[in-house]
């Protein structure tokens, strides 16, 4: 795949793969109530317009729909549901930039990474225990994603992503806001947890 990073993101091949992934994952509709089943028709009618808006940096992501899901024992977990269009764009971004960041991650980082799994994390832990290490640190990252500093995150992103248009698009997703019980809330920090892999893992 040649061209700029943005060209790669908006290539027909990349967008088609992104569409297939979003369609397979399905999931709930976002704030606009568009299902993934309606996405194909929407893209047939508006695909070129969508690409042009992104190229001209005029595309505006919709707020993420926040819903509560029971974790059992009275605990609830807040989930973020982007619109089908935003899931498509996020997936298209992810497919292109993920390999750029993948080589920077620690080999024993297993969350949301290609060719990594929970089972591999357990096996590595057992190997470490068998090597004689006996201390285990259990860290709960429950609120981590809600507290991420946008400027620091974008500083890290910009070390690898040099194109202003792509960095700006990612930043727009960070500040697109959330809708909770019909009310819009600005997002000045944090990253909404989405049902697809996060753009920056």
Language-model segments: residues:
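Non-catalytic, polymerase-adjacent accessory regions of viral genome-replication enzymes
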Residues: 1-44, 48
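Amphipathic alpha-helical interaction elements
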Residues: 7, 24, 28, 98, ...
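Short alpha-helical scaffolding segments that buttress acidic/His motifs in well-ordered protein cores
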Residues: 18-22, 92, 169-174
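Glycine-/proline-rich flexible loop or hinge segments
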Residues: 24-37, 70-79, 106-108
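Short, Φ-rich (hydrophobic/aromatic) sequence segments
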Residues: 46-51, 89-93, 97, 170
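Conserved polymerase palm-domain catalytic core
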Residues: 53-54, 60-67, 72, 107-108, ...
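Conserved pre-motif C helix in the palm subdomain of viral-like polymerases
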Residues: 76-105, 187-201
